[in-house]
Amino acid sequence: MYRMKKTKIVATMSDFRCTEEFVKNLYDAGMDVVRVNSAHVTEDGATHIVETVHRVNPAIPIMIDTKGPEIRVTTIADEYGNSINFRVGDRVAVRGSDGSDMTTRKVVYMNVPTIVRDIPVGARMLIADGELEIRVVEKTDEELICEFVVGGAMRSRKSVNVPAVSIDLPSVTEKDRRFIEWAVKNDVDFIAHSFVRSAKDIKAVQEILDAHGSKIKIISKIENQEGLDNIDEIIEASYGIMVARGDLGVELPAEAIPNTQRRIVEKCICAKRPVIIATQMLYSMVKSPRPTRAEVSDVASAIYERVDAVMLSDETAMGDYPVESVETMARVAREIERDETHFKPMIDIDTKTGRTGRYLAAFRGRKTVMAVCYQLHAQRILALSYGVVPILRNQELHDKYHFLVDALEFLDQYRKLKGEDLLAIVGGSFGPDGGASYVEIANVDNIRRRNEEIVAAQKC
């Protein structure tokens, strides 16, 4: 059933809570896309999620996040228990490792063998999302001598951010490669690649997809300063962009995030790329049945910016109120959009790629785009685009007259059309892929009468 909401909702799902009833409840509440985070699930667990979702509705698209290239502290040595406490002013050596060396009070090992080479004196290193901070005060060929600026408990495998410094990391890790190949085999629609720094990272993922003949679309997650510095080339090389405000907020001052988000959204809309806003949008609803006013305003601000989608993470993956979180987000979207929900649909046909529907969405028109698709993949990828309602037709029509008659009948299943309703119809070439080739604007009665007469004449 058509749900009057232009802004789409991406909901993260975990394998420990993924029954058919749960998926259906989230979908009925307003979820449009299911996200799976490969950092927190095995391949078997991810397969269970995909199979369950597609049993509920094969039209629900699946997005999987890669873990991406990242820097982490190695495991804390056994003699220190679970953590090592450091105070402001303490000094430690930082060395690169293949991951086998244990971190001690004197030497902090990080899982990038070449890290000493890449980091200069004066650089800041943020550990555990900024809970601890060290600054490089000296450097030798073998190690960095660092001083704690912010102390605290250092635990095993905590993340490390180095703002404004380019680290030589692989574009695709071995785990990423395995999950990308798994995604190809398991009917996934989007890959959200983490910690994208340049177009080179996207091309590395695309090469794997091309080698398998896959149509999976790449969403680039912007999570660090290097990604921001190269945002234009990243947008150009990507299908879409996710503004991942968690890690981005570690590297940038908190007050810089809103303007950064707005600039990325504007660039994506101009480039006709879907854009998703993510991280802690309704985070209090992990434990509370109601969001804070600030969270509602955050969601509303993203919707006012006309983003394609807003995303829920822990709220639906592990929170106590997953369905309520989706319902809340959907209600906010409908409230913000309610002055623009008059159903005067624009019909788009794209038999292969969904490209025309995505381009129409980029204009952020006041009217809903009804996208008639003849392939399930096109229907799924358009489910992420702003204001687009993708409809699957099993029978491909070979001329515009049959298409228009069929489309009007099909639209009546979603919302009754009045004879005086004005429609804009964008259609393709009904042959070799040539993209959209015509636009027609007329009221329902005129379209129906004219094209039914032509179809009847063709049968004679």
Can you annotate each of these PLM segments?
Residues 1-460:
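Non-catalytic helical/linker scaffolds that mediate oligomerization, partner binding
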